[in-house]
Amino acid sequence: MLGGSLGSRLLRGVGGTRGQFRARGVREGGAAMAAGESMAQRMVWVDLEMTGLDIEKDQIIEMACLITDSDLNILAEGPNLIIKQPDELLDSMSDWCKEHHGKSGLTKAVKESTMTLQQAEYEFLSFVRQQTPPGLCPLAGNSVHADKKFLDKYMPQFMKHLHYRIIDVSTVKELCRRWYPEEYEFAPKKAASHRALDDISESIKELQFYRNNIFKKKTDEKKRKIIENGENEKTVS
């Protein structure tokens, strides 16, 4: 066992006293905790292109994923995957899907792809596991409830990694249209490319607009009035 003075000298020789080591450990532990909390606030943005909206017969043909922090800054871009589907399914798509997926080049890309649904889920799951902790980060997107139905059915392992709640930009859009019609007129309009990665990027920009123009930071004056109103209500009650 080292003597007290010798032990202290050795500790100082490798970088500090016992107290300094404890302080450094606290700082590093706090930084790790903050990083973990930050990762838990991330959003998993997903957009799918399908052969239609019938969950019983239609299939996913394209998918893309972006990860943002809670302030909507893009942190990572995931795989943008084209999934092989049989020609019979593509030929049975609605006229709308045939027109738009044909114009965008997606139909041709699907026919040329060799990616299976199982491979796509594996790549997506590998990506989100690197970027987010399990069970904490929500699925986000525009009308993302429709995407979620297909993900629940065809990519259950991917969905198990996410939180059960969703962040649907279309909900904010509809509330803004009703409550703040003047601001709504300036909301970014979708380019309607009907390609997965483009649609996600547009959804993030749209939510950024609502955040900056609808979810406004309270000024000190507003905070004061809210506090006063709260105190008045307590007095009356």
UniProtKB/Swiss-Prot annotation:
Keyword entries, A-Z: Acetylation, Cytoplasm, Exonuclease, Hydrolase, Magnesium, Manganese, Metal-binding, Mitochondrion, Nuclease, Nucleus, Phosphoprotein, Transit peptide
InterPro entries: Exonuclease_RNaseT/DNA_pol3, Oligoribonuclease, RNaseH-like_sf, RNaseH_sf
Family annotation (Pfam families): RNase_T
Location in the cell: Mitochondrion intermembrane space; Mitochondrion matrix; Mitochondrion; Cytoplasm
Residue sites binding Mg(2+) 2 per the record: D47, D147
GO-annotated molecular function: 3'-5' exonuclease activity; 3'-5'-DNA exonuclease activity; 3'-5'-RNA exonuclease activity; magnesium ion binding; nucleic acid binding
Transit peptide feature range: 1-25
Positions contributing to Mg(2+) 1 binding: D47, E49, D199
Modified-residue entries (Phosphotyrosine), positions: Y122
Cofactor(s) the record lists: Mn(2+); Mg(2+)
List of catalytic residues: H194
GO cellular component, one term: cytoplasm
Residues found modified as N6-acetyllysine: K173
Signal sequence residues: none
Main subcellular location of this protein, as a coarse class: mitochondrion
Keyword Cytoplasm tagged: yes
Subunit structure, interactors included: Homodimer. Homotetramer.
Functional summary from the UniProt entry: 3'-to-5'exoribonuclease that preferentially degrades DNA and RNA oligonucleotides composed of only two nucleotides. Binds and degrades longer oligonucleotides with a lower affinity. Plays dual roles in mitochondria, scavenging nanoRNAs (small RNA oligonucleotides of <5 nucleotides) that are produced by the degradosome and clearing short RNAs that are generated by RNA processing. Essential for correct initiation of mitochondrial transcription, degrading mitochondrial RNA dinucleotides to prevent RNA-primed transcription at non-canonical sites in the mitochondrial genome.
Homology family: Belongs to the oligoribonuclease family.
Name recorded for this polypeptide: Oligoribonuclease, mitochondrial
Native source organism of the sequence: Bos taurus
Encoding gene, per UniProt annotation: REXO2
